[in-house]
Amino acid sequence: MPTSKQIINKKQDEVSDIYGKEMIRVIRSLLKHKIIDTESLSKKTGYSINTVRRALYTLQKMGIVRYINKEDKTLWQLLETDYEKILDTLLEPYKKEEKAETGELLFICPKCGRKYTLDEAEMYEFRCPEDGTLLVANQ
């Protein structure tokens, strides 16, 4: 059974693959500072201001950060302080999409009416294991 650290590392890798490795560094820096301006965040992470802003706008759309206008500066405030929850929030739309993709496609045996998932159909080489009939996609 995977440890908590292994689970977080896996989620972190997935976020990095989807959003880029800069997202992880921006999140970690936000966790340390709670409220920070874009320029300081750019210096702390070593990424350009545009790269940092892209990450921040994505985090804002997901409800993880909000911006505060204070005098001439835009400050960014982290709304969620649990690293794993932040990763889960970022991965949620992709997990839903993944479930929808795998959940929609079924294969049916026209002879006996049994239904098979894509994985099962591939395993049986798209033939019904009961009667050998070629399976038909049902969408």
Curated annotation (Swiss-Prot):
The keyword DNA-binding applies. It comes from the Archaea. Keywords: DNA-binding, Transcription, Transcription regulation. Residues 7-91 form the HTH TFE/IIEalpha-type domain. PROSITE patterns: HTH_TFE_IIE (PS51344). One of its GO terms (molecular function) is DNA binding. Monomer. Interaction with RNA polymerase subunits RpoF and RpoE is necessary for Tfe stimulatory transcription activity. Able to interact with Tbp and RNA polymerase in the absence of DNA promoter. Interacts both with the preinitiation and elongation complexes. Transcription factor that plays a role in the activation of archaeal genes transcribed by RNA polymerase. Facilitates transcription initiation by enhancing TATA-box recognition by TATA-box-binding protein (Tbp), and transcription factor B (Tfb) and RNA polymerase recruitment. Not absolutely required for transcription in vitro, but particularly important in cases where Tbp or Tfb function is not optimal. It dynamically alters the nucleic acid-binding properties of RNA polymerases by stabilizing the initiation complex and destabilizing elongation complexes. The winged helix domain is involved in binding to DNA in the preinitiation complex. Belongs to the TFE family. This is Transcription factor E. It comes from Nanoarchaeum equitans (strain Kin4-M).
